[in-house]
């Protein structure tokens, strides 16, 4: 006897799946494609980030070699940025005390030179005119910056005056009442 539930049916070859694992293979292929796409996306983003880091590093390295690359947008108009400071180079002339008063009115001081690179920048940028800086001394006393710290002899100061200025050869000194151009400086953080 034949059970009606167990009926054998003839199946033609066209009705058979081409590959018995075909459904599993398609799922595997889709997953593999997604994994490769994700891998390439991660690689692309990694290359972009590395390129940005390299570009920023190159710009930062140029800051020390070529100051014009690093002009600070944070500085007020007519001030020049260099190594996280803003500098103002006057066109007018005043004595040392009046020059400091002007700088003070701008929330700044006469320039304090903190490195050899900064000195070179100031000497190049100031042009041929002499400019007061924030270094002075009382008769027979050591040189002090406007903020009260002692000068550490980073560069020679010629002359016997009580106030320092930059000329075309470096630093020199003169009496406080002599009129010269001046350089103010302030941190670009305060701008």
Swiss-Prot record:
Which cellular compartments is it found in? Cell membrane
Any idea which UniProt keywords this protein has? Cell membrane, Disulfide bond, Endoplasmic reticulum, Glycoprotein, Lectin, Membrane, Receptor, Signal-anchor, Transmembrane, Transmembrane helix
What GO terms in the biological process aspect are recorded for it?
cell surface receptor signaling pathway
Give the membrane topology, semicolon-separated if more than one: Single-pass type II membrane protein
Q: Which cysteines are joined by disulfide bonds?
A: 75-86, 103-184
Q: Which residues are glycosylated?
A: 95, 147
Protein origin, superkingdom: Eukaryota
For this record, an example GO cellular component is: membrane
**GO terms, molecular function:** carbohydrate binding; transmembrane signaling receptor activity
**Tissue-specificity statement:** Detected in peripheral blood leukocytes, osteoblasts, lymph node, thymus and spleen. Isoform 1, isoform 2 and isoform 4 are expressed in T- and B-lymphocytes, and at lower levels in NK cells. They are also expressed in B-cell lines and LPS-matured monocyte-derived dendritic cells.
Post-translational modification summary for this protein: N-glycosylated.
The residues exposed to the Extracellular compartment are: 60-191
What is the recorded function of this protein according to its Swiss-Prot or TrEMBL entry?
A: Receptor for KLRB1 that protects target cells against natural killer cell-mediated lysis. Inhibits osteoclast formation. Inhibits bone resorption. Modulates the release of interferon-gamma. Binds high molecular weight sulfated glycosaminoglycans.
Protein name per UniProt: C-type lectin domain family 2 member D
């Amino acid at each position: 006897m034949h059970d009606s539930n167990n009926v054998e049916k003839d199946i033609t070859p066209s009705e058979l799946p081409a590959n018995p694992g075909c459904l599993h293979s398609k799922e595997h292929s889709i997953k593999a494609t997604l994994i490769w796409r994700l891998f390439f996306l991660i690689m692309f983003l990694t290359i972009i980030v590395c390129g940005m880091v390299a570009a920023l590093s190159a710009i930062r390295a140029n800051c020390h070699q070529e100051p014009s690359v690093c002009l600070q947008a944070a500085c007020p108009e007519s001030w020049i940025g260099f190594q996280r400071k803003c500098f103002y180079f006057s066109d007018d002339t005043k004595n040392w005390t009046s020059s400091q008063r002007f700088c003070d009115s701008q929330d700044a001081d006469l320039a304090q030179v903190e490195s050899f690179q900064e000195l070179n920048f100031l000497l190049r940028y100031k042009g041929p005119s002499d400019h007061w800086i924030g270094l002075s001394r009382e008769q027979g006393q050591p040189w002090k910056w406007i903020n009260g710290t002692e000068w550490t002899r980073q560069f020679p100061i010629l002359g016997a005056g009580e106030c320092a200025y930059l000329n075309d050869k470096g630093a020199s000194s003169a009496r406080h009442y002599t009129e010269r151009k001046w350089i103010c400086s302030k941190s670009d953080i305060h701008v």
